[in-house]
Regions:
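Long, charged, low-complexity terminal extensions
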Residues: 161-391
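Inter-heme linker and motif-flanking segments adjacent to c-type heme-binding CXXCH motifs
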Residues: 1-174, 298-391
């Protein structure tokens, strides 16, 4: 927007200290006015109420990104500010602050969203828990630690997200602009908004699992689309044969959004004081294109896009983490398949699903396996030259 163009992000005087350091809870910003303090804020009170950032400070932006509570990320909902251990073990039982993980030096905050264009100062579970977090006791400890080389901690320890506040899963802009009454879904969320179009929501959402090596391929405004069937806006890069790749959980958000049918590129749209003013796509696209410096053929359509958001918050207690049978076939879970003298090692708990209502959680074929790797061999066997596991 024109206001954003005028902001010099390198000028330290443009940093709003109160957003992070106000502890009165009374500070508010005016998003429509370049982020200036909202009218009516008692600046004397706020100026006298300065302290370390709390979860509420961080959440003032991150809990509401996307235009409302938990809309964008899915694993950052307002309840985390006063969490219980069932919602998030770190912020709940341990009462950790955001900066306990997102270490900060000279106001440089480690860790960024998967949707951000760059990542500086990666935040990893291993920083605190190490590479062998399951201990040396217990029959399964070594096997669980073996999984860490292939499966991210979040995959097992965040079985679902958006546990209390629904998150948006899709939006169809092609249906926007209609005067129709929205219906409420099972979570009490509207299935339509004139500004956005048709909307779907999810609660207790099971993630999508993808290989990821810490890099991604992002669509840059102006890039020509290879296909108009399904456009990935930020694809996680990784594969079972690529070193450093591990299986991570993701939220996937899909949309039907405008694109130039002649140039085959996605189109920027001016919404505020643009489309939302008269609901004319052509005019709003022309204004968006002009502001971005792109060219527009004058012909537009709608294309399906999908955006990935990595899941890192809402970690459950260890007893609620995924069990063997939540991912693998029950018939593959037997110690004696490999340990021939493992009398008494097989326990009923090994084949019990912690989340029996979730079927086919892991799509092994989508991850590049012909079948369950517990049967045909995964990294545990193939990389160590063991061949295929016994049947």
């Amino acid at each position: 927007s024109p206001v954003q163009k005028e902001i010099d992000f390198k000028n330290i005087k443009n940093i709003d200290c109160f957003v992070c350091h106000d502890v009165s809870g009374k500070y508010r910003k005016n998003g429509a006015n370049g982020g200036m303090p909202a009218d009516g804020v008692d600046m004397k009170l706020v100026s006298a109420s300065i302290g370390r950032p709390s979860k509420t400070n961080c959440g003032a932006c991150h809990f509401y990104s996307g235009g409302g509570p938990n809309i964008k990320h899915g694993d950052l909902e307002p309840q985390l500010a006063n969490s219980n251990s069932g919602l998030d073990i770190h912020m709940g039982m341990a009462n950790m602050r955001c900066q306990d993980c997102h270490k900060t030096s000279s106001h440089q905050i480690a860790g960024r969203s998967f949707m951000a264009p760059v990542t500086e100062g990666r935040v990893d579970c291993e920083t605190c828990h190490g590479e062998t977090p399951h201990g040396i006791t217990g029959v399964l400890s070594k096997h669980l630690d073996d999984h860490v080389r292939t499966v991210s901690c979040e995959t097992c320890h965040i079985p679902s997200f958006a546990k209390e506040t629904p998150t948006r899963l899709s939006v169809d802009f092609s249906q926007a602009g209609q005067d129709r009454t929205p219906k409420m879904d099972v979570n009490g969320m509207p299935d339509y908004d004139k500004r956005w179009g048709a909307i779907t929501w999810g609660k207790n959402v099971v993630p999508v699992y993808k290989w990821y090596n810490g890099t991604r391929k992002s669509y840059i405004l102006g890039d020509s689309m290879a296909s108009t069937d399904n456009v990935d806006l930020n694809t996680p890069i990784g594969e079972k044969h690529i070193p450093g790749s591990r299986i991570y959980p993701f939220k996937v958000h899909t949309a039907m959004q405008p694109y130039d049918t002649e140039k085959n590129v996605l189109l920027p749209v001016k919404f505020r004081d643009g489309y939302w003013k008269d609901f004319n796509w052509d005019t709003a696209i022309k204004e968006g294109v002009k502001a971005s410096g792109m060219e527009y053929s004058g012909k537009y359509g709608f294309v399906k896009t999908q955006m990935y958001s990595s899941i890192h918050h809402e970690v459950v207690p260890a007893v609620k983490a995924l069990g063997c049978a939540d991912c693998h076939k029950v018939e593959a879970i037997s110690c004696r398949r490999c340990h021939k003298k493992a009398e008494g090692m097989d326990q009923p708990i090994h084949t019990q699903m912690v989340y029996p209502d979730v079927k086919n959680r892991i799509d092994f074929k989508a991850l590049g396996y012909e079948d369950d790797p517990a049967f045909i061999g995964g990294r545990f066997y193939l990389q160590l030259g063991r061949g295929k596991p016994p049947k």
